[in-house]
Design a protein with these regions (language model features):
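Short, small/polar residue-rich loop motifs at catalytic or cofactor-binding pockets
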Residues: 132, 240-243, 304-306
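Noncatalytic scaffold domains of N-terminal-nucleophile
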Residues: 4-96, 100-102, 106-152, 212-213, ...
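Extended C-terminal subregions enriched in glycine
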Residues: 300, 333, 342-374
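Internal maturation/activation junctions in enzymes
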Residues: 166-262, 274-275, 282
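Short, well-structured alpha-helical segments that form the helix of a local strand-helix-strand
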Residues: 26-37, 107-111, 175-188, 347-357
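Glycine-rich phosphate/pyrophosphate-binding beta-alpha loops
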Residues: 146-154, 244-247, 259-270, 323-330
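Active-site rim segments in enzyme catalytic domains, especially the processed small/beta chain
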Residues: 119-121, 254-319, 343, 347-348
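M16/insulysin-pitrilysin zinc metalloprotease superfamily fold
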Residues: 154-170, 311-319, 326-351
């Protein structure tokens, strides 16, 4: 089954520009158009992902035409050109939202997806509408942490922090066995709620206030056995991903915390002919279990892992931050904040510090962690 939900980034760019932009919309695209048409050196990271993806995607329609030459993808330092993408970006730059969600680009996307067995239609694209949403927030030791609500997973970071606020982490010490155990158990409890509740709020009633309440966090914290790993159902959400994050501030005090992702490395493998890009793979995160809050439905947004964030102190900006890495993101959000607030790290140290990442089943393996892994 080819499950492709509507791509939303372009509509999001348009809305951001309408609300905050002070340059012409078309001028924002010109540097990227130039890189796509004239070429740019391939970085080590991009070369790695291209090489890793080619065995999976080289038999997919149109992949080789865009990303391969003489049977190989571009290597580190090679100059890569994508004139098809340059053409598509020029259409968007000139026509704005209509250049992508209506007309020939939208028709090409819809026709291609349907030839591949998918259900995305021209009308789905034409009617797509990104939304302004209110962030969710919880106080952690005097700092307000702001995250995206469902259909994202920002609530997970808040739940982890609320649970861990019931313990003296500084006394334990960063990366002590006690701290690692408590963090992992808090993560497992938060992810159990993620698996059950997180979905498109337009289709499901999600108990956000309860999930991020301090009283609920105390109840969850009481479930943690300091001497034994708990058996908690795994979330069943795939952990792979490929994401970019950036944050920026201007002289007027505005900050942006921005994250985008095609998911699963390069995305879905679906490359509409002549457009120079691969469609994202976020539809994979729908559930196929009838009655589940995140079950696939028409017009519905799937559960998302990507979550930009802010922290404020006494109503004033403290940091704008985010990380990449699918299910790693809320775990890393919580740890960066803990490093800053509990352990007194500066921002560079908090970001550079090693991170705990728990994934897969919550069933203990009964194998000891290797000391050198810490």
């Amino acid at each position: 089954m080819c499950i492709r939900d509507s791509p939303g980034a372009v509509d999001g760019w348009v809305k951001l520009h309408e609300k905050f932009g002070n340059q012409s919309f078309s001028s924002l695209f010109q540097p990227t158009i130039d890189y796509a048409r004239k070429g740019h050196p391939v970085s080590e990271t991009i070369a790695y992902y291209l090489d890793r993806s080619k065995e999976v995607f080289k038999e997919y329609p149109n992949f080789s035409e865009v990303w391969m030459k003489d049977g190989e993808t571009a290597g580190k330092g090679d100059v890569f050109k994508n004139p098809q993408l340059a053409d598509t970006l020029e259409i968007i730059a000139e026509k704005g939202r209509a250049g992508f969600y209506e007309g020939e680009v939208a028709k090409t996307i819809a026709d291609f997806i349907q030839t591949q067995g998918g259900f995305l239609t021209y009308d789905d694209l034409a009617s797509f509408n990104s939304e302004w949403v209110d962030p969710v927030s919880s106080n952690y030791r005097g700092y307000a942490v702001w995250e995206l609500p469902p259909n994202g997973q920002g609530v997970v970071a808040l739940q982890i922090l609320n649970i861990l606020e019931n313990f003296d982490l500084k006394e334990m010490g960063l990366f002590s066995s006690e701290y690692i155990h408590l963090f992992t158990e808090a993560k497992k409890l938060a992810f159990a709620d993620r698996a059950k509740h997180y979905a498109d709020p337009a289709f499901s009633e999600i108990p956000i206030k309860q999930l991020i309440s301090k009283s609920y966090a105390k109840e969850r914290a009481a479930l943690i056995d300091k001497n034994k790993a708990a058996l908690v159902d795994k979330s069943g959400i795939p952990s792979g991903g490929d994401t970019i994050y950036l944050t920026a501030a201007d002289k007027f005090g505005n900050m942006v915390s921005l994250i985008q992702s095609n998911y699963r490395g390069m995305g879905s493998g679906m490359v509409p002919p002549g457009l120079g890009f691969m469609l994202q793979d976020r539809g994979e995160l729908f559930s196929l279990v009838e009655g589940h809050a995140n079950v696939i439905e028409g017009g519905k947004r799937p559960f998302h892992t990507i979550i930009p964030a802010f922290v404020t102190k006494d109503g004033k900006p403290f940091i704008s931050f985010g990380v990449m890495g699918g299910a790693t993101q809320p775990q890393a959000h919580a740890q960066i904040i803990i490093n800053l607030i509990d352990f007194g790290y500066n921002l560079q140290e908090a970001g550079d510090a090693p991170r705990i990442v728990h994934s897969g089943s919550s069933q203990p393996t009964n194998e000891k962690m290797q000391t050198e892994a810490v």
